[in-house]
Amino acid sequence: MEKFEGYSEKHKSRQQYFVYPLLFQEYIYAFAHDYGLNDFEPVEIFSCNNKKFSSLLVKRLIIRMYQQSFWMNSVNHPNQDRLLDYKIGFYSEFYSQILSEGFAIVVETPFSLRELPCPKEKEIPKFQNLHSIHSIFSFLEDKFVHLDYLSHIEIPYPIHLEILVQLLQYRIQDVPSLHLLRFFLNNYSNWNSFITSMKSIFLLKKENKRLFRFLYNSYVSEYEFFLLFLRKQSSCLPLAASGTFLERIHFSKKMEHFWIMYPGFFRKTIWFFMDPLMHYVRYQGKALFASKGTPFLNKKWKWYLINLWQYCFSFWTQPRRIHLNQLANSCFDFMGYLSSVPKSPFLVKNQMLDNSFLIDTLIQKLDTIVPATALIGYLSKAQFCTGSGHPISKPIWTDLSDWDILDRFGRICRNLFHYHSGSSKKRTLYRLKYILRLSCARTLARKHKSTVRTFMQRLGSAFLEEFFTEEELVFSLMFTKTTLCSFRGSHSERIWYFDIIRINDLVKPLN
């Protein structure tokens, strides 16, 4: 009990007191502008030519906010011309989006800084070096092979956006800032009603990615607060007594009251054990919870999460969003890989004096493969091939130059190999390379109105080199006369790269 109170107080100490006038200071917007430029987002979103995060533009918008005529014209304009109404509405929505993005940058800065604790004598490492998607799979290889059960969790979305605002009250105690956040959310259409479809969620993500990501991460970190505490204590809670742990605000009072009414009750029904074989991994909206123990214990964890979302976050989630399976007899789709931990036979030679024995044993090893059918399906949607995987030309790219077409196809191929380098079976990757390479050849042949064979003979080895992966480039430098086909199967081992900070675009629908 004392451990939870100390842990909770430590969590409360992270609450930020945002002074409302600071949102209107010029240096804050200059800092937000620089923060947006130097962030880990793609270059096409934050660039020096992007005027969305201009501090001068935001400052002018703040000044216009005080002008009542601006808001009157933006909201109430029944007698205006339709074209003028459209322009005013467009600019009003555009200004609101700029302000909400700037607000999200200012608010999320303290949360991002506290996630990077570092001693003063050491230089703070770059953010890109701290997070790699492939590092998750290295963790799975090291930890999951020793576990028995796996829960595949689809984290539900909150029913109403007001729940997200209320969750921020634990960390932000500045009421005007919360009202400003409500203003941004209510400025979108239909946000006063319940969100009942993923289409509305996607609309908010599309119009204001940074603000939605900040709210969603705040919600996820709040629910993981409970899970992290129980993970650190490795507590085993009976289902009948788990209701006393669900409401965080009155947690301590309920525990004290329950202890007075039922002295000695927790000694019999709640017991703690230190079990290091319990691991939790999350990426975006999917999470994996693996543990060792009995099926009954893992089912209790499942219902604990369901009750947590229901009583703590005021929305009910369906039990089918949490799939509990034996790790050795199931596979899970996570971050574009179809992974499993099968038991494989392994022969061990044992030497005893003059006699030797072969011992047949079973070992567990993480197996990661690429879902070929799904990837070919998304390649067909992008018009690189048919639904059956037959390569076709890309007519929309025929207006580009030859080297631009080669560069685009080669970059897509190298990115696929780079992201899926951890696949246990490379045959699927080479099939995808064949589709992209032949699609590129058909596109070039269509542009020049010739046959594929003629065009490939004219380009020669330069055409193949555009589709070389990083591993194949190393082999081509070592053996200059080696062709692509000769070392295709030379490197079937899995390789995890630690410079991948975002998921591949073709894998996003799979996630």
Curated annotation (Swiss-Prot):
The cross-references to InterPro entries, in alphabetical order and at most eight, read: Domain_X, Maturase_MatK, Maturase_MatK_N
Q: Could you tell me the keywords of this UniProt record?
A: Chloroplast, mRNA processing, Plastid, RNA-binding, tRNA processing
Subcellular location per the Swiss-Prot or TrEMBL entry: Plastid, Chloroplast
A molecular function (GO) term: RNA binding
Question: Could you give a single Gene Ontology term from the biological process aspect?
Answer: RNA splicing
Gene Ontology, cellular component aspect: chloroplast
Provide an example Pfam family for this protein.
Intron_maturas2
The chain's disulfide connectivity reads none
> Which parts of the chain span the membrane according to its record?
none
Please report which protein family the annotation says this sequence is part of.
Belongs to the intron maturase 2 family. MatK subfamily.
Q: What does this protein do?
A: Usually encoded in the trnK tRNA gene intron. Probably assists in splicing its own and other chloroplast group II introns.
Q: What is this protein called?
A: Maturase K
Provenance organism: Lolium perenne (Perennial ryegrass)
- The gene name reads matK
